[in-house]
C-alpha cells in the first residue's frame, strides 16, 4: 500500500495515554445540586469540580439519578466528570446564562462544558450531555431567513477542550448542542470512543466532532447522527490572519455515520491537515461520504490522508474533493489566481476498498487551476450512483475503480486533469 508507513506512524502517535487514577470523589448533590430538571444546578456542579480539582490528585465529580439543569461549567485538570447511565446534564434554555466571550479568536459564547489550559480530563459514566440547543437553532434559522449573515461563533458550542492535553470521552451520549458538539481546539492527545453524538438532522451547524488544530486524536466506535458534519477536521477560520496550527495525527475508525454531511476535512483549513487515517467507516443516508473541502480564503497544505475499508448506503455524494467550497464544482471557465497564504493544496490522498450503493452522485475531484489536486489514488473502489464522477484540475490514479452510473458516463475526465488507470 502506498501509505503503509504513514498508517503505522499515525496509529502509534494517536494511541491514548494513561494517567494516574483520581483520589477524591465529589458528588454534586453534596454541594447542593437537586437533579430535578428545573432547578439550576450550575453553581453546585462548579463547586464540586473546583473542590475536586483542589485535591492533590484531582478527583471524580459524580452526577447520578436525575436531570441536572445547568449553565456553562468549566472542567479543571485531573478531573473525571462521571455522568451515570440514566442521568442527564441538561443545558439551560436561558441564553443569558451563556456569557459572551472571545471564542476561537472571535466574539462568541462560553461553551456548555468547557476546559481551558487543562490536562488529564475524562468524561465518562454512560450518561447524557444534552446541550438543549433547540432555541438557539430556531434563532439561527430566523436570522438566516431575515438575510442576516451571523457569526460562526453566534451560538455556544457543546463540549470544548481549549489548549488542553490528555483528554478522553468514553461511553457517553452527547446531543443537541447549540452548534459544534465536541471540539478539541489546539488540544493534544484526545480519545473519543464508544460514544453517540446526536442532533435533529435539520439542526444547523450541529457537527458531531470537530478536531480543530489538534494532534494525536483517536475517534473510534462513534455513532454520529446530526445536522451537519459527522466529523470535520479543521484548522484556522475563514480569512484567518494567522498563524494557524495544523490538525495532524488523527485516527477515525470503526464508526457509523447516519444523518449529517459526512466525514469531512475542512472547510476551514488555514493551518493545514496531515497524517489522517479513516478506516472501517459505515455511512448510511449521509449527504456526503468522504469530503475534503476548502477554497481560496481558508486553505493550506492538506496531505497524507488515507481512507480505507469504507461502506456507503444511500449516500448522496460518495466522494467529494473540492477546492471550491461551498460549491462542489465550478461553473464555467475558471481562471488561475495568485497563490497566497490561504491557497489550499490537496495532495497524497488514498481511498481504498470503498463500496457505495444507492448514491445520487458518484463523486467530484476538482482542484484550483493554480493548485490542482495531486497524487490522489483510488484503489478497489466500486460506486453505484445515479450520475457519475467528475475529475478536473487533478492528478489521479484509478486502480480497479468501477463507477456505474444510471445517467451518463461513469467517470468524466476534464482536459485539465491527468488520470492514470490501472
Predicted regions and their residues:
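Bacterial N-terminal signal peptides
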Residues: 4-14
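Extracellular/periplasmic carbohydrate-active domains that bind, remodel
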Residues: 17-422
Amino acid at each position: 500500500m502506498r501509505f503503509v508507513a504513514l498508517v503505522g506512524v499515525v496509529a502509534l502517535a494517536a494511541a491514548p495515554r494513561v494517567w494516574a487514577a483520581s483520589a477524591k470523589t465529589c458528588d454534586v448533590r453534596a454541594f447542593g445540586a437537586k437533579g430535578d430538571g428545573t432547578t439550576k444546578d450550575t453553581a453546585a456542579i462548579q463547586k464540586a469540580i473546583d473542590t475536586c480539582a483542589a485535591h492533590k490528585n484531582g478527583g471524580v465529580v459524580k452526577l447520578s439519578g436525575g436531570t441536572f439543569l445547568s449553565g456553562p461549567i468549566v472542567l479543571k485538570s485531573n478531573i473525571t466528570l462521571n455522568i451515570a447511565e440514566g442521568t442527564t446534564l441538561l443545558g439551560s434554555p436561558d441564553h443569558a446564562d451563556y456569557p459572551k466571550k472571545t471564542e476561537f479568536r472571535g466574539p462568541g459564547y462560553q461553551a456548555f462544558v468547557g476546559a481551558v489550559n487543562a490536562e488529564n480530563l475524562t468524561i465518562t459514566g454512560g450518561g447524557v450531555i444534552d446541550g438543549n440547543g433547540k432555541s438557539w437553532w430556531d434563532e439561527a434559522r430566523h436570522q438566516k431567513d431575515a438575510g442576516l449573515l451571523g457569526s460562526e461563533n453566534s451560538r455556544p458550542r457543546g463540549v470544548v477542550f481549549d489548549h488542553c492535553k490528555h483528554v478522553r470521552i468514553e461511553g457517553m451520549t452527547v446531543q443537541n448542542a447549540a452548534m459544534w458538539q465536541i471540539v478539541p481546539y489546539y488540544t493534544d492527545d484526545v480519545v473519543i470512543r464508544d460514544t453517540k453524538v446526536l442532533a435533529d438532522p435539520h439542526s444547523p451547524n450541529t457537527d458531531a466532532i470537530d478536531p480543530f488544530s489538534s494532534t494525536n486524536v483517536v475517534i473510534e466506535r462513534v455513532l454520529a447522527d446530526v445536522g451537519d458534519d459527522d466529523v470535520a477536521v479543521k484548522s484556522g477560520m475563514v480569512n484567518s490572519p494567522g498563524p494557524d496550527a495544523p490538525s495532524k495525527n488523527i485516527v477515525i475508525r470503526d464508526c457509523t455515520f447516519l444523518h449529517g454531511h459526512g466525514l469531512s476535512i475542512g472547510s476551514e483549513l488555514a493551518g493545514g491537515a496531515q497524517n489522517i487515517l479513516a478506516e472501517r467507516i459505515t455511512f448510511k443516508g449521509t449527504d456526503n461520504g468522504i469530503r475534503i473541502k476548502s477554497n481560496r480564503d481558508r486553505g493550506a497544505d492538506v496531505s497524507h490522508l488515507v481512507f480505507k475499508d469504507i461502506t456507503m448506503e444511500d449516500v448522496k455524494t460518495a466522494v467529494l474533493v473540492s477546492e471550491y467550497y461551498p460549491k462542489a464544482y465550478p461553473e464555467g471557465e475558471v481562471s488561475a489566481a495568485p497563490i497566497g497564504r490561504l491557497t489550499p493544496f490537496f495532495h497524497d490522498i488514498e481511498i481504498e476498498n470503498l463500496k457505495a450503493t444507492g448514491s445520487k452522485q458518484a463523486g467530484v475531484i476538482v482542484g484550483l487551476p493554480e493548485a490542482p489536486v495531486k497524487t490522489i489514488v483510488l484503489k478497489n473502489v466500486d460506486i453505484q450512483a445515479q450520475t457519475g464522477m467528475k475529475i478536473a484540475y487533478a492528478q489521479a490514479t484509478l486502480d480497479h475503480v468501477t463507477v456505474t452510473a444510471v445517467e451518463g458516463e461513469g467517470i468524466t475526465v476534464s482536459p485539465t486533469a491527468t488520470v492514470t488507470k490501472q
